[in-house]
Amino acid sequence: MRWPNSWRKNSEVMEFAVELLPVLRELIAGEQSFSCDGALCAELERFHLGPLAYFRSGGKLPAPWRRQFCGQFRQQAGNALRQQFAFDQLAAMLEENRIRFTPIKGVDLAFRVYPVPGLRPFCDWDIWIHPDDCARIRDVLKRDGWSCELEAIADHHFAMRRKNGFCLEPHFTLPNFNGIPVRELWKECIPIQEGACRHALSPELNLLLLYRHNNIDFFRKSNLPKLLADLGFLLKSSRINWEKLARLCWSFRCGSPELLFQAFPEFFLKAAKPEEKHSAEAARALRSILLAPPQFETYELIMNARHRFSWEWWKTRLRCLRPDNVRLKYLKQNQSGNFALFYCHDFLKKLYNSVLFSAQSSSAELAEFQNKLEKIEYFSSAVPNHSRQK
């Protein structure tokens, strides 16, 4: 199952996404057997929701679509079983070496939140390592046969590791939580049993992670069906302490996911949520952005930001010039003779893009998008950090 990307650039499909929201809510709720005609099946296929429709319908779908969705579901279920077996081996190895870790994102949601793992496809395994164990994790993985193309550190994770066709991404902090003390975040990780090294995110931090991860890079990587499905199953499987969530948002100085509930009331119709306190104007701005993620170039957004050339803006831009960022971007080892050449190339490319987009006048569409970001920032402090890897 692949989550859709093409819908972002097509106004007709975008309009359908709004009509699909009650259907997606019904599929997640699973309170009654799901049934649909061929036309709706075709639309579900466009959004790669066929396996979920097959699972909820008990196979009661029009014959051609039943066979197609059944094949997709079985393929995903088989792949999930293979992934689960291999991941359990990794988890056992980490337990033996007393490496404290927490599965996050897809590998956590598939096996712990969704009704069956086959409904939540994912590519790599994201695990978050306890800060006191980060110094040992790379050597432990190397001894176990996990290899990487180059050893470099990104904004929130170590280099990708591979073994037997599987990909592992060890994190030293959560994505888009930069500036928040890691030990404070780790307090929201719960051991799966007494004395275990394997932990699980608290429902409140998991909810916050899904929301903030979706906001990376000016919402350019947003995937609304995927986000809503993840949130829907999380709310269905977990009891959210809304007061605790509010305390976490205040402590971490980050926007609350509650704004998303107000932005999509037809989807979160029955979700237990606190009284809506956010601006309806900010919610409309968030809804508009998520229904049609921006198609602007990253540097076009960076060089037209209202706060450009501020101290925070400069710190973010300088972090992009870290040698490890260039190594990850061009897959060049530190000892490579061409590294200096690639570093100069990357610097000149950034300089060219900065001058190019600074000289261009802002379009009406870009100005409108910037206004939407400002509304979200003002009412919820939820404007994402700039991309660190451009």
Identify the meaning behind each predicted range.
Residues 2-123, 129-390:
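Conserved NTP-donor binding/palm subdomain of two-metal-ion nucleotidyltransferases/polymerases, i.e.
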